[in-house]
Every structure is written in structure tokens, then in C-alpha cells.
Amino acid sequence: MASNYYSVQIKQCIGLGARNQSRYVKMIHGNIIRALPYPETFLYNNIVHAYALMKSSTYARRVFDRIPQPNLFSWNNLLLAYSKAGLISEMESTFEKLPDRDGVTWNVLIEGYSLSGLVGAAVKAYNTMMRDFSANLTRVTLMTMLKLSSSNGHVSLGKQIHGQVIKLGFESYLLVGSPLLYMYANVGCISDAKKVFYGLDDRNTVMYNSLMGGLLACGMIEDALQLFRGMEKDSVSWAAMIKGLAQNGLAKEAIECFREMKVQGLKMDQYPFGSVLPACGGLGAINEGKQIHACIIRTNFQDHIYVGSALIDMYCKCKCLHYAKTVFDRMKQKNVVSWTAMVVGYGQTGRAEEAVKIFLDMQRSGIDPDHYTLGQAISACANVSSLEEGSQFHGKAITSGLIHYVTVSNSLVTLYGKCGDIDDSTRLFNEMNVRDAVSWTAMVSAYAQFGRAVETIQLFDKMVQHGLKPDGVTLTGVISACSRAGLVEKGQRYFKLMTSEYGIVPSIGHYSCMIDLFSRSGRLEEAMRFINGMPFPPDAIGWTTLLSACRNKGNLEIGKWAAESLIELDPHHPAGYTLLSSIYASKGKWDSVAQLRRGMREKNVKKEPGQSWIKWKGKLHSFSADDESSPYLDQIYAKLEELNNKIIDNGYKPDTSFVHHDVEEAVKVKMLNYHSERLAIAFGLIFVPSGQPIRVGKNLRVCVDCHNATKHISSVTGREILVRDAVRFHRFKDGTCSCGDFW
């Protein structure tokens, strides 16, 4: 009797939130240990099963080991524990040890592979079962395989399973027919989905929702609306229509659909709320979002995890992070989705360090990340070039098995590329079993950032040969690589192919890349002609690019035109004043320099101060020119003095042509010596052990003199120095730079 009582208690815990479920199961388990010295096997099995569903494989194993004579249910529950936890090697080892196997055993094995994204292994296990143990085949097995086919877009596999469904006579069963319909609808095979739909003996609202979802996913809006108007609708139906409209770029119509549901007086639940909020976020419609938030509070859904997560996402997309944080802090229960919404929200609004902190807090709270959350955390590290935390997350990806997901691998390729470790980025890319268009684009962008045009173009060509269609980001990387390598004609060719071959309408960013292509090569007149032929005027980036090139080439005429155009576009943009001032200074026109400075003061235009940073032992050390705030100031300045003497002996000659002050030459030289990147490099030489590269970031373009000085520093110290400035990566080693002095 006692065993039955405790068994019921454990079963009642299943379905509670992760935190409560864990607490109550462990509490009941403790009571069992104290009250029952020899629990019955079926009670042990229920405890193992509960721990399995909680992904607590360690506890599940401990309980299993206490069972005197484990039966098949015991073994299946242990197998389930490893399956749910993603511990594939332990799952396989347990499977091999099983004294007997039934349909549940095979289903758990196949589902374990499926949950870990190991499609090939799941298919192999299924085929083995069909060949040698077909008697164990159940409708659950077929349902699992259909879900696998659907989530991974494997149409041929899905059709193979469909054939077996027909052969076994399961086609009319809802348990199989529902995932079969969903599979076809999800992969866009609408005609097949309709055949399954009309072949079912009983069609419920779930079936209608699946078919409607497939129509919406294929952009067949009118067909979906026709089905929607004639069907019996539940809240999921309304939510699916709202979500489908939003995903087809009809966010306003999605919000209107929500209003129609509300006007009809239909009962609101988590599904419509969770679908309309992303539409508000996509439009940046904060007022509508706040109104829906008020409706959520009135209907008492503010504590629902799904709704709370959607609210966080909406506020983050509307750049209202303080509202997002308020919603998050007030949530009584949080799951991986709500934590992920915060990580993504902070990461995509430029607050990457806080995003990483939120991710670490999530792990401390006992919630394991999924592949999407981990991928977003790694992306946040990439955005701030934080290789230290990113490498730790790489380790987490390996130990958790999430490395097999393409989203995680893509983020790691991007991380190492953005942190200047192009070798590790390439190695990871080559090791990927599955690559999508994002994988190739990440690698193309990494090579482009390093100015390795040949590799960039070769990789792009391979991507196209593999049948993957490049997007605007991919073409940006290719044209940028051509620009940094001075391959003007190739860059022009790829720009033309965007429209003619790939159907991509060039954005303002692509036009800026083309301005950069001409400007870097000194073909300033061609850049000017290109600008005059554009369908719209350049943005600030385009004008600044041309103006920077005019400064480097000393072209006052075109530089003045670019500066005046930039100032007209944005009177408070400092680049128009500072870059033109630099051209005047290089030509000794100090009166013109003074006039520009007066104009800046009158309009309250402030130049963005140059800042460089280096991360060491988890702490970010930032420096500005002539910085006196560092606690290591004396050591840094002494190191700079020592370096300056060594590089002068090595042939370094200061270039003061772009110093904007009318002062003595010696003063100009001294000003150059204490630029922010040199302070950061000196810090690295003092504290970063030899054998490790020194990694420095800078918010502006590295000046010509500091670039030259850093080459000499790498020569006299024998150290590898990586500098990521606003333009590209520079890898200084043995007196040379990876950019070939072209940046």
C-alpha cells in the first residue's frame, strides 16, 4: 500500500514546472528512503522515470543501481534518462546491455538520437529495427520518425515512412495521420498534405490547424484564409492565423486579426497572446504591444511562461529593455524560452556583455540551455570579441552534445572569425557534418574580415556549387573581400551578379561596399561617378568611406564634396568635420582647420573619442589616448618608452602628417606614442604570457602611424598581435600585417 501511495505522489509531480518538479520528487524520494527500507521494483521504476523526465540522469542511475532485480521497465526508464539528457554514448551503452528489448526500448533510442539532432543515427536505428525486430514496431515509432522527418525537412525519409504507414494500415489513425499531415505541411508538400487530410476518417481541429499552418508557411494566404473562415476554430486556430500573417510580412493584418478575435468576444488564452506579440515586436509597435500587455494583465495571463516570454521578446525588439527586465523579474516561473528571450534581446541590442551574464545566471538557476540559447550566448561573445567566455561555451557545447546542432556550430565559426582566430574558425567549419547557408556565410565573412580575398571567393564559389543560394550578407562579405584586396573588377562583377543571378536587390550597405571598393583603390573619380548613378544618396557610412579615402590620398576637391554632403545629411556627424580637417592639416591649411573646429563648437558636434580594449582574466581593460586612469599606468608608460626606442632602432619613423594640431614636430611625435591601441598593446606585452597572441579591439580605424608602429613592435618583441578595428582584422606577426598595408 505504501508503495502505491508514493507512486501516485510521484506521478502527480510530473507536469509541474521544472524547479517545483525537481524539488517535490527529491522530497518524496527522501521520504521513501526513510519510510521504506525495501521499496518494490515498480516504485523504483516510477522514481527513475520521474528523474528521467527531469533530465537528471545521475539521480536516475543511482536509483536504478539500488533495484535488486531490474526488469525491462527499469532498463527502459534508465535508457530514457540518458536519452532525455542527450548523453548519447551512455544511452548506446545501456541499449547494448539490455537483456531484452521491446517497442518502447526502440522508441526511446530513436527519440534520443532525434532529440540530439543525430538524424543519421536515428534512421539507422529505425532501419535496424525494421529489418531485425519489426515485431516491435508501434504507431509511436512511426510518429517519432515522422516528427523527425518534419523537423529536419527530410521529405524522402517522410515519404518512406508514409509508405510503411500505408502498408501497415495505420494511415487513418489520428495518432499517425496527424504527424503525417504535419510533416507534409511543414516541408511545403501541400498536395500530399491535402491527400492525407481528406483521407482521414476523422478530421478534428488539430488537423485543420496543421493544414492551415502549412498553407501559411508556403505563403498561400488566400487558401489559408478560405480554410480558416470555413472551419471550427479554437484559440490555436486564431493563434496560427495571427502568427502566419506576421511571418508572411503582414504584421498589421496579424494585429487586426487579433482585434477581430477580441471583438467577437472569444476567450483569450496564451496562444493568441503569444502569436500577436511577435507581430508588435516586428513592427516596433510599442503602443499596441502595451495595450495587449494590459489585456494580458486583465485576463490573468501575465504569469504564464509562454506569454511572459513573448512579452520579453516584444519589448526587446522595441528596444525597451527596462520593460523586458521588469516582466522577466516578475515572472513566478521561468523556463529556457524566457531566459533565451532575455539573452537574445540584450545580445541583439548591443548589450552583449549583459547577455552573457544573463546566460550564466540562467545556468546558475539550474536551467540547461538548448541549442538556440547556447548559440545566442556564443553570438553575444562574438559581438564583443570575448574569446575567453566563448571558448568556455565551446566546451559546454561539446560536453552537452549541443555541438551537433548547426545553430551552435555556426555561432562558433562566427565567434572564432570575429575574434581573429581564423584557423580555428576554418577547422570548425571543415568538421561540420551538416552546413547550411548560414554556415557558409559565416565562413565567407570571416575570411573577408581578414581580407583573404582568394579564400573568400573560392569558398563563395563552392557554396554556389553545393546548391546553396547566397543572401545579401554573403555578397557583402565577397564584395568587402574584393575591396580589401583591391580587386575592383571582381567586386564589380559580384555586385552585378546580385541582381542578375541571385535576384537580390542591393541595399544601402551593398552600395557602401562598392563606394569602399573604388575608394580604397584610389579610384576616387569612379567612386564619385558611382555615387551620382545610385538610385538613392549614400548614407553616412558611404560618405565617410569616400572621405576617409580622400584623406589618405590627399584629394581635397572630392574630399570637400564628400564632407559637405555628409554634413548636409547629418550636421552633427563628427566625421565630416574631423576627416576634412585632417586633409587640411596634411596640407598645412591651419586656418581652414580652425574654421572647421569653430563650426563643430557652434553646432555642439563632438568627435567620438578613440578607445581600445584588451580582455585579460575575465576583465576588460579600456584605454583612451593619453590615458591616466589605469592602475598600471607607470608600467604601461615605461613599456611604451622601451618599445619606442627599440622600434626606432628597427627602422620605424613616426608619420605626423595626420596630427591635427599646429604644434612642434616633437610634440606631434609624443602625441602619437600614446594612442589608445599602443597603450592596450603595452598592457598585453606586460601581462599576456609569451606564446599567447595579444588581442586588442578598437572602436575607430587604426591610424597609419600606429599600424606602422605595431608592425615594428611585432618584429622586435616576436609576439603575434591581433587588432580588430572599425574596418577589419589586422594580424601583426614578424613585422608584417595580414592586411598587406591595405585597409
Curated annotation (Swiss-Prot):
GO terms for molecular function: RNA binding; zinc ion binding. It comes from Arabidopsis thaliana. Keywords: Repeat. Residues 649-743 are annotated as: Type DYW motif. Residues 542-617 are annotated as: Type E motif. PROSITE patterns: PPR. This is Putative pentatricopeptide repeat-containing protein At1g68930. Residues 618-648 are annotated as: Type E(+) motif. It comes from the Eukaryota. Transmembrane segments: none annotated. Belongs to the PPR family. PCMP-H subfamily. InterPro entries: DYW_dom, E_motif, Pentatricopeptide_rpt, PPR_At4g14850-like_plant, TPR-like_helical_dom_sf. It holds the Pfam family PPR. PPR repeats lie at residues 40-70, 71-101, 102-132, 138-172, 173-203, 204-233, 234-268, 269-303, 304-334, 335-369, 370-404, 405-435, 436-470, 471-506, 507-537.
